[in-house]
Amino acid sequence: MSLNFDFYTLFMEGLQSIEVFVALLGIIAAGLISVSLVSKIGAKVLPQPSESRVADFLPFDRLLSDGTTLRCSNGSYVRVFKIDGVDLTAAREEVIMSMFEARKSWIDNISSTQVNCRIYTIRERAELAENKSNFGNPWLEKVDGKWKESLTRVYKNDHYIILSVPDRKDAIKDLNTASQSTIANLNDYGIRVMYEDENSPAEQSPIYPFVRVLNPISKPKPKARKAVGFQLKELMTSEGIHFTGEEGIIKFFSGTKTKYVLTIGIRSSGDYMDEAMVSSLMSIDCEMTMLHSLVPLYTPKARAILMQQQKMATATSFSSGVVSQYSEALSAIEDSDADHQSLVQYSMNFLVKGDSLEEIEFAESEIQRICRLFSVTPVRENWIAQATFFNQFPGYDTCGRTYFYLSRIVALAVSFEQISTGLPRSDWGEGAITVFRTMTGSPYRFQFHITAGEAAVAHCCIVGPTGQGKTTLLTFLAGQAMRHEDLKVYFFDRHRGAEIFTRTVRGAYVGFSGERKNVSLNPFDTRDTRSNRDFLRNWLRSITMATDALSEREASRAVTTAFEYLRPEERKLKNLYKSCFSPTGSMRRELYRWINPEQYGNIFNADHDSLDLSGNRFVAFDFTEIFDDDVLAAASISYIMHRIQSESTETGSPALIMIDETAPMLKHEMFRDNFIKGLQEGRKKRQAYLCAFQQPNIVDTLGVGDAVRGQCKTMIFFRNTQATPESYEKWNLTASEYDFIEGRTYRDCPYAILLKRPDADDGRGESVILDVNLGGLGPYLKLYNSSIKNVLLVESLIREYGEEAFVTKYLEGFGG
């Protein structure tokens, strides 16, 4: 037993200044009582390196009749718990502290039961569920396939707690007490005891986590059933294992496949440890098991250890401060109030896994890099790799690098972090819109909807400065959403940003004026319904701004005349102009410009309205020039929004209404009124409005801040290095969320976004950082390019090769 008497980090800081964001862990070498037993572990308790029948050395004997308790060969008892975990990535400080105190209380409470505890965090590749898709477009199918290929290396972290108690009087009673404390203290983490009966799935069996670490290749899922002794051990091991002795490498083999495992321990650390270190380690691009071994010591035993060490320090130390620090530690374990802490015997190890030596060496280098950022020194375990491997199982309780810590310190190391996973379905149908990676490498199933329930709110607001990729993300999400075959997408565009993608999916890119005009409009060329009649009356009043009683009667007479006295081909505004409006009335005077060819007469007087919303699944409207004319903008917006609402009402099909660069459009009263109405009523029509802004406070300047924040239950924030706290003040961000926006965190992921849903998860909220780097699309990323240079290139390719062939030529670089 070796000693280091610089106790300030371990005890004094642990008692006085627990910070959860940048937390004092005080682990390993910088001020601790260490019990380093590396030199004391021999082959007498472990199989020889050449052995491959690991079943011979497993401790398990049987699963008891309660379906939850394992009995070991040495008479000890084991109980296993699954922890769902919580996402505290952007939680508020009071929530983080509350969850931290729950973990600390759990450790303190089980100290009186004198049980051994192991915590597994098993990080394995996640297989993405087959995502329903019926795009109806070959290019969308190819994009989706390419995106799936880029997500082959995504991971899931699973947490397990394993309690074990040696064969002694009241062993089961102590195990039950510890189990009750574990469930009570960690209830908010989503904890459940693992249980097996005839009908339960194998993943719920108490043997399942042990099977996972024993079989990293084949990943079988056996059940214990009534297997006893060696039969149970054989059942749990389907793979061979070889402790090579070659620089600590362990080999698993199953058939022709081999998996390499490397064990890494913690040799020393600096004074401070951020919880972010553990989070970063469990985000590395590799499979691994993080093993925490802890034995919370019963107070009399802890007291005896500390008093003995204090006496030794008195005799050997030249510093009176060292002795007083022991007194502080003794005070902590004796305290009966909130300052009480238990003394814990603790170790942390990593077992990294890979299909090649290169993979595990990469993982080792990443662990080294991350740990050293936090002044921690990891070490590859060589000849004690075998011991570290067997430390995963009850009965093998002699750890290679074991240290004493106070419970607050250990509680910081075992955070049970679990990043949000998104939703598998929405009101629009089965499957996610798309899947993104989180910062831990786990898959996140993106939906616009806040829940999977029927008619859930799906409105979304995107905030980010220019040049961050908002248009690219919008068009990508629009295309991915078209996996729902009945979905209609309406994209309000400016400066032709979505034109390339629209033409790729064979959608309609609609221009209303000038050289880009390609549609003929006639609001009266429509079915005779009450809704259409009401709209036309209101539309006539809005484009003339005539509100007097005579104008009201004239508008009603014109609509009645159109549907009851004119043939369909005669229903035009110019045919109603003289017959329905008084020469001396204000409405006739104001309507003149809408029939005069020199003004707006050619806009809404077509023989046939060619704006086809029923035959096109993707329609983009180019509003670049329309907004240069306030009068034309109001008339056009109101008509288009009416057509969209009518289509949704008549078909019942879901609709995605995407408004790129929303702020300039909201300056127009007619658009603003329709936009707010859509946010308020769109949910009932299965509509999702997506709006995008460059500045976070522009919505308040435009007078729609409360409506946007209140109705857009999904918020996406791009980074903004020029951000000020004042500009984001009304978005109710946490400190860590704002740190991300300002660019202080996740700097190694330049294409990350913050997805925030304050009302998700039954009001508990959701906040997750997603990697939206679309580089995995390869050449298909060009389909989302919004630069005018590429738009003009596509225009020329269409003229030369036609609508059918231009995409291939464009992707091949023709004309570039």
Residue ranges and their predicted role:
Residues 2-421:
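Extended, folded cores of ATP/NTP-driven motor/assembly subunits in large transport
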Residues 77, 159, 488, 617, ...:
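The start of beta-strands in P-loop NTPase/AAA+ ATPase cores
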Residues 81, 619-621, 657:
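Hydrophobic positions in the central parallel beta-sheet of the AAA+
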Residues 87-89, 118-133, 140, 147-154, ...:
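Switch/coupling segment of Walker-type NTPase motor domains
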Residues 187, 372, 482-483, 503, ...:
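Anion (oxyanion) recognition and catalysis
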Residues 422-449:
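N-terminal pre-Walker A segment at the start of P-loop NTPase domains
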Residues 442-443, 448-480, 486-498, 508-516, ...:
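Conserved P-loop NTPase motor cores
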Residues 533, 548, 561-624, 631-650, ...:
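Conserved P-loop NTPase motor module
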